[in-house]
Amino acid sequence: EFADNLDSDFKVRQFLAKELAKASVSRIVIERPAKSIRVTIHTARPGIVIGKKGEDVEKLRKVVADIAGVPAQINIAEVRKPELDAKLVADSITSQLERRVMFRRAMKRAVQNAMRLGAKGIKVDVSGRLGGAEIARTEWYREGRVPLHTLRADIDYNTSEAHTTYGVIGVKVWIFKGEILGGMAAVEQPEPAAQPKKQQRKGRK
């Protein structure tokens, strides 16, 4: 049963990614409560997904139900700040690269927008034949702090690919939103065991 669910989840994601390519979809969450499927689409442009009077969502629901073979429910969640969502930032950079915008300008714009909206730090990494160069290379741009080794750091990471006339350019984005301090049980430090006192020897007179 798990294998079947995994396969249908993959097909649902594939279908939605293709259908909603222009709807700025950040992520798709699939849940399976008792013989049904619930799909939550996180998007920056809910109007495009919903369509006129909810027509488009109804079409999606029918197709998802057919793929999964169980009744489907589709929820739309709006992403309020797309500039602070790593997937949407990466997709925005790739769409600019495909429109032949200079890669440095696209990177800088994304970084400035994220920092303006309250990100603690952001790093953008692009690799490939940048600017149509013969030899592929990697360039990155960072502003603020991006602590990748700090476990409590809330870092949003995602990737995207730009298909240009020169080949594929990979884009990676890390956005540092702050540190998660609550929610973790504090580990009590064990008290050091009492050291036995050394008996002082009386010196010989």
Curated annotation (Swiss-Prot):
GO terms for molecular function: rRNA binding; structural constituent of ribosome. GO terms for biological process: translation. The keyword rRNA-binding applies. The keyword Zinc-finger does not apply. GO terms for cellular component: cytosolic small ribosomal subunit. It holds the Pfam family Ribosomal_S3_C. InterPro entries: KH_dom, KH_dom-like_a/b, KH_dom_type_2, KH_sf_prok-type, Ribosomal_S3_C_sf, Ribosomal_uS3_bac-typ, Ribosomal_uS3_C, Ribosomal_uS3_CS. Residues 12-80 form the KH type-2 domain. Keywords: Ribonucleoprotein, Ribosomal protein, RNA-binding, rRNA-binding. Binds the lower part of the 30S subunit head. Binds mRNA in the 70S ribosome, positioning it for translation. Part of the 30S ribosomal subunit. Forms a tight complex with proteins S10 and S14. Belongs to the universal ribosomal protein uS3 family. This is Small ribosomal subunit protein uS3.
